[in-house]
Structures are given as C-alpha cells and as structure tokens.
C-alpha cells in the first residue's frame, strides 16, 4: 500500500512537469511559433503568435506582451544548447517613430540626423516577466517568475528590436 501511494504521488508530480516542458521538436512543429532571425545567428527567436496580446495603450505609448522562445543554435559558444521560454512585454513610444521624428524640422531637412536620432533611441523598451529554461529534449532546467518590471532600451541593431516589431505588427497591425 505504501509503495502504491508512493508511485501515485510520483506520477502526480512527474506528469505535470512533462506537460509544461517544451522541446525543440515541439517548438518547430507548432504552427503558432513563428521563427524570427534564423540562419547564422547564435540564437533563433520564435514568437508564439497565439500568446500575443495588447496590454495597454494611450495616445503615445503602446504595450504588447508575448511568449518568445530563445533557442540557442549549434554555432553558439556554449557546450549545451538551451531553450528559454520568455514572457516579455514590449513598450513603444510613438513619439520615436520615423513619422514623428520626421515632423521635427531639423530631421526633415537632413536624413542623416534622422538616422542618428533613431539610433540614439528606437522608442522601444523591453521587460522580462518570466523565464523558463529547457534543454533541447524538453527537460526543465529552471523557472524564474514574478520578475519585477524593469524596462530597458532596445537598440535598432538588436535582434530583440526585430522581435518587438513583429509583436507590435501582430498586436496592433502596424510597426
């Protein structure tokens, strides 16, 4: 009886862990996961289209949230490839859009100044809400939740800017 109870308890603990685990195969086979920046990059980003949602918007600020899988590729420097399942919130200040910046007379006359202005501040910020780590087979390695909201700037040349643009396009229909 004690053995049966122990087995039942073990099954109750192991089955939920397996349901939440995500493997590389599962990510690639799910049609909701859209690959962003594949190729020679050390990390491929997959955005779960079904998780994209508008969080908040006002006249100048837009926020969108989504699950992004950061998958380390074989050409990475690390020995063990990993998968991060990251819940992110992007914040975009519309005052930093190209159209808004062009309304400023100094930038409308000299496009090189416009480029410098966009490089200085893309208008996009990012915060990480939670992270779950897995190996390629789907074995859970760690879980970090309830991360305090702390936005960091996303530069134009950062791959996360491309990911953020995709999320905003899906959430709001524009980039």
Regions found by a protein language model. Give the residues of each.
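Sec-dependent N-terminal signal peptides
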Residues: 4-16
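N-terminal secretory signal peptides
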Residues: 21-83
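Detector for glycine-centered tight turns/loop "hinges" at secondary-structure junctions
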Residues: 42, 111, 123-124, 136-138
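A structural signal for short, hydrophobic beta-strand segments that form beta-sheets
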Residues: 46-49, 103-105, 118-121, 126-133
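Mature extracytoplasmic domains of secretory-pathway proteins
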Residues: 56-123
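C-terminal partner/receptor-binding element of secreted or periplasmic proteins
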Residues: 133-175
């Amino acid at each position: 009886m004690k053995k049966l109870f122990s087995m039942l308890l073990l099954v109750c603990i192991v089955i939920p862990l397996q349901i939440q685990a995500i493997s590389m195969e599962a990510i690639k086979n799910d049609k909701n996961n859209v690959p962003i920046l594949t190729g020679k990059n050390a990390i491929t980003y997959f955005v779960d289209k079904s998780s994209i949602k508008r969080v908040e918007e006002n006249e100048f600020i837009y926020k969108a949230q989504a699950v992004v899988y950061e998958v380390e590729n074989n050409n990475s420097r690390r020995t063990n490839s990993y998968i991060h399942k990251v819940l992110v919130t992007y914040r975009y200040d519309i005052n930093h859009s190209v159209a808004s910046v062009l309304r400023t007379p100094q930038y409308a006359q000299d496009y090189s100044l416009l480029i410098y202005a966009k490089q200085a501040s893309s208008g996009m910020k990012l915060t990480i809400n939670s992270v779950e780590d897995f190996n390629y087979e789907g074995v859970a390695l760690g879980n970090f939740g309830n991360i305090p909201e702390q936005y960091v700037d996303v530069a134009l040349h950062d791959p996360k800017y491309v990911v953020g643009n995709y999320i905003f396009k899906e959430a709001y229909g524009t980039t």
